[in-house]
UniProtKB/Swiss-Prot annotation:
Stated role: Replicates the viral genome, host DNA polymerases cannot substitute for the viral enzyme in this process.
The name this protein goes by in its record: DNA polymerase
SUPFAM superfamilies according to UniProt: DNA/RNA polymerases, Ribonuclease H-like
Superkingdom as given in the UniProt entry: Viruses
Keyword Transferase: yes
Region (Disordered): 936-976
Source organism of the structure: Choristoneura fumiferana nuclear polyhedrosis virus
Keyword Hydrolase appears in the UniProt entry: no
Length: 990
């Protein structure tokens, strides 16, 4: 770590990357980023290549026109249109070929030179310019290429000495390279920045009055990290250290520091610029210090540009700006983790939590007040270390999760762009449909030739079709399509429902299981059930027909766009998996193929969810077919009980099958046989063969691509209720599904409960389970505030303020604002002036204090809790324990109430011994018959229907917050008995 002037820093990085070099015809380069300049009609491609073991960067330009589409509103009374528009079939519910097809007249116009109004009215305004380039040219971000002729790079720019590059002569100038022919990949240069802000020590930092103390920047290139810290301090400071790759530049003017930081990007020249929550905090704060101005970012000798901003709305309605850096890829990594459901296994999305989980590393331990005090005393070394570590960790996370491969795979496979990195799956599918609609082909049934058959994907139709606003028309009638006569419908069309019906989503079939412990159950699951259904029934928006009889029908056109896409994705994934598995020497190619096959799977599986958003009629029919297939599978499986062929093959006198549990596309099957007929030492092997035989027999009864696969032989299975179970799988590993996994349960309770349940799974012994539970719960009580971290004992709740939006037709609520636990804790954090104030979508860790008041009033942010001066309330912890003890009672039954009660009482006594306001005792009470679980009545179903969309939205929001997925319907047509007639309840001491 050494202090340098900004001029010295510039000089040190002047040769950071070669500026002048030769590129031969054999040198492969990779397009990292593209930018289209609409003012001059020029595409700028930023590229990286390897020269003599060193990364070299350059750019080239291509003169080209870029096109968008707008609707033509001419009357079209003549044969030709003065606007030279083209007529396309509409993508959504176009009609019936050779009868009537709804058309949309579209003008293709040049974006370069067009007015702002034209661009704002474009039908493809949801796309970035980079998406358009990907769809209209062979230049795609992430593509490997070669020059057809040897070139010379001068001042980081490659220009052909003979003539400028032009799109019309692309094949003469460039060759696209198949990555399968390569042995190593070309990586982007990575950078990450972070700011530290000053405060008075009592309140949160405010850009109106609090300066930026420093801006850290880490750059990764050629496997080497360089770290730079831009520091603002009015007085002279000294910093010790001898790290040659850490540079500290001290400014006595804050504005100069900010300007120099952004100017330095031209020297470091990263392809990807990361931050963590930068869209919400860092960048708006910097703008605040610049009096609202956006900073300028330049690259090479190109003119510096201000970042663009675009509104980003999360799935729970939170709204923030996303910053796009034009010449650079900018990614707020916090948004990626917040948007990706696959990352829900972490406790929260704080940088320290993610770093510990994925990297086994932590931030520098420095609280905010101490940092400000050290800054005031000119002790900057620790602050700089803290700042730079926060810059290193996001880069390491990005690379650990191989997000570069993910980002560029999306570009190559679906014409997304690097600016779409945090886009939701809906945007991915809409962009894919837009491109496929324009380039669609079909095979002529008469000639057998492949002919062009374009459609136009108008995204506005999706909004009209799915809107729930009150009005004179509802449902799909908003599309205003001409109704097709009933006599002209294709004979095999499927009726989906009424055109003007407002449809609520219906989930898959779920059988309510009887709680218990089962041995040797096995799972038999459908392979990609909903994907197979969509192919089988030809589910596509182009196949929708609005009929004169008032109903929506689904045509069975197997050449529909989505059907072709799904078949392509299935084939593509199969081929990519084979390519991946054949890579024994190249880690680069293995990772590339693995990322691409995962993306194929994710896209195919998400199309059903896409229909669930925009066309619930179609989604509900898909779900209905899924329920029918699961019901049929259950009948087939149980119908194999005491099958003569199976009995003979395995030399058994009896072999019955009972489906214990079914959920959407999977079944849990319990085989019953005489234990003495299968030797214990070969039991698992024999049962595996029986499972495989059942799979073969069931698949022989299905047609049209429906297949089931034997997934797991579970030596022990514990079923609690729907979507809540655990088991020991075929690899002898314990798996928990939906039970003891939620983030709103403290870590120590999760650990104690899971450890206890493992005793049942491993030993089928309830007493060992209770002994383990008692030992661990008492141990964690004694370790509170001493040897165990406080985070193990905390709860967390997501903070949402003003989520969603109020439409013009809706009146704003006048009722008093509800103070949630999260809001209450956030206000405490604000008043105390902590270093991190949670924003919308953040989970806030908290505990309850043992004070008088409601649960909300007791809630206190964990960040401020001091166990030496504050007394924790165990009220909520014991409520969770009460639920767990009742679950054990439900599994094991009334005959074990005494043992359960003894264990429960011992734990409760320990935790209640010092409580002043929240002291509880446990009582065993009789369950009323009306309380018992029963099949939903018709009244209940009607009540759900009357609840309407708002209730469903609330249910989904709760589901997102708690990692639940209980929207699916429950099929309780069979009476399910219960093991217990008693339950535990907590009561206050009188």
């Amino acid at each position: 770590m050494k202090i340098v002037t900004y001029n010295q820093l510039q000089e040190a990085f002047r040769d950071y990357s070669p500026r002048d070099f030769a590129i031969s015809r054999d040198n492969v380069f990779r397009v990292m980023r593209i930018y289209y300049n609409e003012n001059v009609g020029q595409l700028v491609a930023f590229c990286n290549t390897q020269l003599a073991g060193r990364l070299a960067q350059f750019y080239f330009t291509i003169k080209m026109d870029l096109y968008s589409y707008k609707q033509c509103y001419n009357s079209h009374i003549f044969a030709t249109c003065r606007n030279r528009c083209s007529s396309y079939n509409t993508f959504v519910a176009p009609g019936v070929k050779n009868v009537y097809m709804d058309k949309i007249n579209v003008i293709k116009f040049k974006r370069n030179g067009s007015s702002f109004g034209e661009k704002a009215a474009a039908l493809d305004k949801f796309l970035h310019n980079a998406n358009r380039v990907h769809m209209q040219t062979p230049v795609i971000e992430g593509t490997y290429m070669r020059f057809r002729r040897a070139q010379r790079c001068r001042n980081n720019c490659v220009t052909d000495d003979a003539r400028p590059f032009e799109l019309e002569r692309f094949a003469d100038d460039f060759q696209v390279v198949n990555p399968a022919t390569l042995t190593t990949k070309i990586e982007p240069v990575m950078a990450c920045f972070d700011i530290e802000t000053h405060s008075d020590g009592h309140n949160s930092s405010k850009p109106e009055c609090d300066v930026i103390m420093c801006i850290g920047l880490a750059v990764l290139k050629d496997n080497r990290y360089d770290k730079i810290c831009f520091v603002y301090h009015k007085e002279l400071v000294e910093i010790s250290g001898n790290d040659e790759y850490t540079h500290v530049v001290v400014f006595n003017n804050e504005s100069h520091m900010i300007a120099s930081f952004f100017d330095f990007f031209k020297y470091a020249n990263p392809d990807v610029i990361l931050d963590y929550n930068g869209d919400v905090f860092d960048l708006p704060y910097i703008r605040g210090r610049l009096k609202g101005d956006k900073p300028l970012l330049g690259r090479y000798d190109l003119p510096a540009l201000q970042p663009n901003t675009k509104l980003f709305i999360t799935k729970i309605g939170n709204r923030t700006d996303t910053y796009y850096f034009n010449y650079y890829i900018h990614i707020d990594l916090y948004k990626y983790f917040g948007a990706d459901a696959n990352k829900r296994d972490v406790e929260n999305f704080e940088l320290n939590t993610l770093s510990q989980y994925y990297l086994n590393d932590n931030k520098v331990d420095l609280n905010w007040q101490t940092m400000v005090a050290m800054y005031n005393n000119k002790q900057l070394g620790t602050m700089i270390d803290y700042n730079l570590k926060d810059c290193l960790l996001p880069i390491r996370l990005f690379n650990k999760l191989k997000l570069n491969d993910f980002m560029y795979s999306q570009c190559l496979m679906y014409r997304l762009c690097t600016d779409d990195f945090i886009c939701n799956i809906s945007h991915l599918i809409s962009s894919t449909f837009f491109h496929l609609a324009l380039t669609n082909t079909r095979t002529d049934p008469v000639t057998g030739l492949v002919v062009h058959d374009p459609y136009f994907f108008n995204k506005d139709d999706l909004g009209r079709m799915s809107s729930k606003d009150a009005g004179f028309c509802a449902g799909m009638s908003r599309l205003q399509r001409k109704r097709i006569p009933l006599k002209d419908l294709p004979a095999n069309s499927i009726r989906l429902g009424a055109i003007n019906e407002i449809v609520n989503y219906e989930g898959g079939k779920v059988l309510q299981p009887r709680a218990g412990v089962y041995e040797f159950a096995f799972s038999l699951d459908f392979n990609s059930l909903y994907l197979t259904i969509m192919i089988d029934i030809c589910a596509c928006l182009t196949n929708l027909i609005l009929c004169e009889d008032g109903n929506v029908y689904l045509n069975q056109d197997k050449q529909a766009i989505n059907v072709q896409l799904l078949l392509q994705l299935l084939k593509q994934r199969s081929e990519l998996k084979k390519c991946r598995d054949s890579q024994t020497d190249s880690e680069f190619l293995y990772d590339l193929y693995d990322q691409m096959q995962n993306l194929s799977k994710r896209t195919a599986n998400s199309i059903y969810g896409y229909y669930g958003i925009f066309c619930k009629l179609l989604a509900n029919y898909i779900t209905r077919v899924g329920r029918e297939k699961l019901t049929a599978a259950i009948g087939m499986i149980e119908g194999l009980s005491n099958d003569a062929e199976l009995l003979s093959k395995f030399n058994l006198s009896t072999l019955t099958f009972r489906v214990l549990y079914g959920d959407t596309d999977s079944t849990f099957v319990l085989p019953t046989f005489k234990r003495d007929e299968i030797p214990e030492e070969s039991c698992m092997v024999t049962l595996t063969r029986i499972c495989a035989a059942v799979e073969t027999r069931v698949n022989g009864l299905f047609a049209n691509g429906y297949k089931m696969a034997f997934e797991n032989l579970m030596s022990v299975l514990i079923l609690l209720k729907k979507k809540k179970y655990c088991y020991i799988n075929s690899a002898n590993k314990i798996v928990f599904k939906g039970w003891l996994v939620k983030k709103d349960m403290p870590v120590f309770m999760r650990v104690a409960f899971r450890t206890a349940i493992e005793q049942v799974l491993r030993h089928q012994d309830l007493q060992k389970c209770l002994d383990s539970l008692l030992i661990n719960m008492l141990m964690y009580f004694d370790a509170f505030g001493t040897t165990k971290p406080l985070t193990d004992y905390s709860f967390s709740m997501t903070y949402n303020d003003g989520a969603g939006k109020v439409t013009e037709n809706e009146s704003r609520p006048t009722k008093r604002r509800v103070v949630t636990v999260a809001r209450h804790c956030r206000e405490i954090l604000l008043n105390k002036g902590t270093d991190f104030v949670p924003g919308n979508g953040d989970r806030i860790p908290y505990v309850l204090l043992d004070i008088q008041g409601s649960v909300t009033q007791k809630a206190y942010p964990l960040r401020l809790f001091d166990p030496r001066t504050m007394r924790i309330s165990w009220l909520k912890h014991m409520t969770i324990l009460n639920t767990f003890m009742n679950e054990l009672l439900e599994i094991f039954g009334d005959e074990h109430t005494s043992a359960l009660n003894k264990c429960y009482d011992a734990i409760l006594t320990k935790y209640m011994q010092h409580q002043a306001y929240d002291k509880k005792r446990v009582t065993l009470i009789k369950i009323n018959a009306a309380y018992k679980r029963k099949a939903p009545s018709d009244d209940a179903a009607r009540k759900r229907a009357r609840a309407g969309p708002s209730a469903l939205r609330k249910q989904k929001a709760a589901s997102n917050d708690e990692d639940s997925s209980d929207e699916d319907d429950e099929d309780c047509s069979q009476a399910i008995g219960s093991n217990n007639t008693f339950k535990f309840s907590l009561y206050k001491y009188k």
